[in-house]
Amino acid sequence: MFNFEISAHCPHTKGRCGCFHTPHGPVQTPRFMPVGTLATVKGISTEQLARTGAQMVLSNTYHLHLQPGEQVVAEAGGLHRFMGWDGPMLTDSGGFQVFSLGNLNKIDERGVVFRNPRDGRTIDMTPEHATNIQMALGADVAMAFDQCPPYPATENDVKDACRRTHAWLERCVNAHTRSDQALFGIVQGGCFPHLRRESARAVAAFDLPGIAIGGVSVGEPTDDMHRIVRDIGPLLPLDRPRYLMGIGTLREMAVAVANGIDLFDCVLPTRLGRHGTALVGGERWNLRNARFRNDHTPLDSSCSCLACTGHSRAYIHHLIRSDELLGLTLLSLHNITHLVRFTNAMAQAIQDGCFSEDFAPWQEDSPAHHTW
């Protein structure tokens, strides 16, 4: 039911392209996944989302547990039917949100007790509970409940988080019973190379259908993130999809693909869109800027998204300056399409044997003027 096929390798890097098969269809890799935290990508319908070329969508267990509750989603027939998306889906376990957003009362070997920010009630989140919620939601891929340490953190604190993450992973595996849902483990370890290597080996030993690298994009220097991906890549199974969590800039994705990463997710494209910013090439354009007022050309003539094929820069500028919701939707659609096109282009370059040449500039500090 779950199978990962690699169709080509880059001869000069660790980059590869392939296909991850799920019950709701294939996911061509490398691939960017839009984030639909509450069973919706903000401001975008599922029909519009499909036009971006997105194949797999991420939702969040923590937020869906709080609202509307997994029982409501299960009664609707699962997450796919609830939101009207018939493609592959992944649910994050909510571990990151529990530790970053929740008002923690207690964390111990059993799990986490935190206060619901909506109504103040106490929630006891254990690995078993997080797994049961995700089984009720019914996405194609569920993520193991993990402890994501903040940055910076002491070595002892990160070591404790790794120990809990590995122990909790075993409990998630034992609790997970849906054969039509894959469970991915998550590598932690902060910016400590030896802890990252230990975690990679520990998680890989569970022989799960896929593996993720967590605890990045939490404030650490970019070079540290690149080193983490480079160092632990050789320790991960070659025949399983590798998912780098929370990453969505062009440079970071190019570096990650060169080191054998297959899947990415990030709120960046929609967050930028909601603030009037468009991704064009390697640049970020603020469409509120007066220079777009009389510019009647498409946002990006090479892009086939709804914003670029039907509207001008001047019109989108007008929408943003007028605080019209359509402007935010158009920019969000464009930005998602932009990242999907970028990962598609990397896959094609790997197939054609020119990835290391064509995408080397994107791994530099300032790739703004490069195209693909």
From Swiss-Prot:
Protein's pathway: tRNA modification; tRNA-queuosine biosynthesis
Cofactor(s) in the UniProt record: Zn(2+)
GO CC aspect terms: cytosol
A matching Pfam family: TGT
Keyword terms: Glycosyltransferase, Metal-binding, Queuosine biosynthesis, Transferase, tRNA processing, Zinc
GO molecular function, one term: tRNA-guanosine(34) queuine transglycosylase activity
InterPro entries: ArchSynthase1/Queuine_TRR, TGT, TGT-like_sf, tRNA_ribo_trans-like
Enzyme active site: D92 (proton acceptor), D265 (nucleophile)
Enzyme class, spelled out: transferase
GO process terms (BP): queuosine biosynthetic process; tRNA wobble guanine modification; tRNA-guanine transglycosylation
Name of the protein described by the UniProt record: Queuine tRNA-ribosyltransferase
Native organism: Synechococcus sp. (strain CC9902)
